[in-house]
Each structure stands twice: as C-alpha cells, then as structure tokens.
C-alpha cells in the first residue's frame, strides 16, 4: 500500500508545483543541444563507461525496460556525481526506456538523488553498498563518493488547486489516456458515457519513447479497447491530435501533470472537463510537504476510501 501511495504522493507533489515539470522540459532542451556530441554522455547511454555495473544496467534497461529500485538509485547517482552529467538527461533516458516511466515519480526521484528535491540531501552510491546488494558481483567500482549535492536556488510555491468533480451527464464523450487504462475499475465505471475515446499520444511526445516501450503502450491501449468492447461499450482509439475536433460535451480521466496535460493546455482545450479519482482527491491535499508528513495521513486516506 505504501509503495502505491508513494507514486500518488509524487503525483500530488507535482500537481501542487507544476512549474517543476515545465522547468525540467526547458532545461532538458538546453542540455540536449549542449551534450548531443558529448563523448561522456554518448558513452553513458550506450553503456560504454568502463563502470561495469552501470554499463550492465544500461543494457538491462534497454533490453528488459525495467530496473530494480536499488539499481535505479545507483544508476542515477553514478550518472550525476561520477559521470558528471545533467540529471535532466538521465531522467529522459529512464522515461525513454522504462515500461513504468512516470513523469512525476521519475522527475522527482532524479531531483531527490541530485539533492535538489530535498535541498542539501542527496543520494551517493558507494562501492560497498553496490557490492553488498549485488552479492559481490562487481569489483573495483571507482565512484565519486565525496560529491556535494547539486545546488538549486529556485523555490516553487504551492499552488491552490481544485480537484473536485462537477456533475456530469451521460451524453458526454470520455477521454482516457495511457496512464489510466482501467476504466472498468475506476470511480466512473457506472456512468453511461456516450462514447469512450482511448487517446494514443505515444508518437506525439517531447520525450521520445523507445521501440519496446511504444509497443508495450500500444498493447495496453488495445487491451483496454478489447475489455471495453467486451462490456458492449462504444469506444475507439484516437490520436491525441484528433481530440481537438470534439465539442463541449467532453470529459477526461485527469491525466496528471505530464505530456498529455501539456498537449491539452498548449492547445487551449478548455472545453474538456476533468474527472479526478477519489484516491487522488483524498491524497493530494496532503502533498504540500515531504513524504514523511504525508505518511501520517495514509491510515486516514485508506479509511476514507473504504
């Protein structure tokens, strides 16, 4: 339960500070241009750093599209402090290759390792820790174990958002995005929507996905389509560009801060009425501070859900 709520917390934290995501994308574009021919960066993404554990994780990530949480932390720390590469590029590399890549937990996790999510507190990978938890698989791991946290003077104020749901009628068309593909288990499963549109934004992203991740996400879209049709629900998959042509009778399972919401906002699609999950409504109000403060409210959140 705590692991699930970790992700919900990260999403809520970013919802209250959407400027963090916006600034991440701005800085990412700058670093892409600066490092596009940088040998150190190119060696890192190809797994040619001569740091065996890191190179193995690059290969594992590209082939399996997954890394254990320990490996993710070690990877990010080595990227930032030993290879001295911008955390923004590392976060992009993860989003490109992870099946479970998420704009909030990924961005904020990399910020935490760097020492800017919790200012002055960073995560430094160490040789002994890697050896211990990999059963001494690796030897002579030369890392920068004395690096200082990355500095950031930017302070983000907490925004006051309204996550309440307005009354919806049954004639509306519903949009579902790729991070909400369980409609039949959602809070809105009993609503009789006119039609459900499953939005494909896989090829229309600022951060391009690997072929494996695109295939995986497309299979999830098809699976949701199949399950909805089995329930005799009128539905189809549409490209994200096509949602601009729908009128006012449109609502959407809220996609959260990230690329799908960016598309909606950049195209000024103000006609879309967002629907928020109950667990998010209950949780995000407590995301104004750190996780350990949020953790105190978990029993209350669970009680209110049930």
Regions found by a protein language model. Give the residues of each.
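Active-site-proximal binding-pocket segments
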Residues: 1-170
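Trp/Phe/Arg-rich N-terminal binding region typifying the photolyase-homology
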Residues: 1-2, 6, 11-12, 16-29, ...
């Amino acid at each position: 339960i705590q692991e699930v709520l970790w992700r919900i917390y990260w999403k809520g934290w970013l919802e209250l500070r959407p400027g963090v995501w916006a600034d991440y994308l701005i800085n990412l574009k700058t670093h892409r241009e600066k490092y596009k021919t940088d040998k150190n960066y190119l060696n890192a993404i190809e797994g040619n750093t001569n740091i065996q554990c890191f190179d193995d994780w690059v290969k594992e990530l590209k082939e399996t599209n997954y890394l254990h949480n320990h490996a993710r932390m070690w990877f990010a720390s080595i990227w930032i402090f030993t290879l001295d590469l911008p955390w923004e590029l590392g976060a992009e590399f993860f989003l490109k290759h992870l099946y479970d890549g998420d704009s909030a937990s990924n961005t904020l996790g990399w910020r935490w390792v760097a020492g800017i999510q919790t200012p002055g507190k960073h995560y430094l990978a160490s040789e002994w820790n890697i050896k211990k938890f990999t059963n001494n698989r690796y030897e002579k791991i030369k890392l920068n174990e004395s690096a200082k946290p990355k500095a950031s003077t930017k302070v983000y104020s907490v925004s006051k958002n309204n996550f309440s749901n307005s009354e919806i009628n049954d004639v509306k068309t519903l949009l579902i995005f790729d991070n909400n593909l369980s409609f039949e288990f959602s809070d809105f499963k009993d609503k009789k929507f006119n039609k459900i549109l499953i939005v494909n934004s896989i090829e229309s992203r600022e951060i391009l996905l690997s072929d494996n991740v695109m295939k995986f996400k497309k299979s999830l879209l098809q699976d949701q389509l199949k399950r909805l049709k089995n329930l005799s629900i009128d539905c189809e998959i549409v490209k994200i560009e096509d949602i601009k042509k729908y009128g006012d009778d449109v609502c959407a399972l809220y996609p959260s801060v990230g690329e799908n919401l960016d598309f909606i906002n950049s195209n000024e699609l103000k006609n879309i009425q967002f629907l928020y999950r109950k667990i998010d409504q209950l949780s995000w109000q407590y995301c104004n501070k750190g996780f350990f403060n949020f953790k105190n409210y978990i029993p209350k959140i669970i009680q209110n859900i049930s």
